């Protein structure tokens, strides 16, 4: 447990950031899974879910949660599925 005041503050800040990052990643993964499930089932709203998944991937990459190359690779794979 940190003793220095600034280190104590950092622990609190990191905890908040970890929760925020985990929530963002979960949202991204859920959007991708929803699209894949809809595409496999041949649902009508697959194109809307595709756009939502791409948006979540871009948001995660821009915030540094995933590497930009991973986002691009995942988007490419989703686009291939969408065709």
Swiss-Prot record:
Gene Ontology biological process terms, A to Z: translation
Keyword Transit peptide on entry: no
Organism: Lactobacillus delbrueckii subsp. bulgaricus (strain ATCC 11842 / DSM 20081 / BCRC 10696 / JCM 1002 / NBRC 13953 / NCIMB 11778 / NCTC 12712 / WDCM 00102 / Lb 14)
GO cellular component term, pick one: cytosol
PANTHER family with a match to the protein in the record: 30S RIBOSOMAL PROTEIN S20, SMALL RIBOSOMAL SUBUNIT PROTEIN BS20C
Keyword Electron transport (UniProt): no
Protein name, as recorded: Small ribosomal subunit protein bS20
GO MF annotations, alphabetized: small ribosomal subunit rRNA binding; structural constituent of ribosome
Entries under Pfam families matching the protein: Ribosomal_S20p
